[in-house]
Amino acid sequence: MQDQTTTRWYHYVSYFFGGAFLANTIPHLVSGISGSPFQSPFASPPGEGLSSSLVNVLWGMFNLVVGYVLVARVGRFELRQTRHAVVFGLGILLMAVMLARVFGKFHGGNL
């Protein structure tokens, strides 16, 4: 029988992508809650056009649920375990940098 506390390689992959999904939650949820249109995969053209605030709230919540599942329901994520936290943080960082570059060209952030 396998030890329940063993972290497998795919747990780290899950924590990385969980961090990425959770980072992607923020711009969509904040824009949606504030009533502002924002880019989404459902806009025309995808990722460039603007989607309604409702679409962004729903997309942000979808990202939140997927991020939760990947972090909290796969393996035994422990924020106090350095490797778990680093992999999770790298997922957040990579997605945040990508989002800054992509959305910066639409909102004046790429100086």
Indicate residue ranges for each PLM-predicted region.
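Membrane-interface extramembranous regions
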Residues: Q2-L111
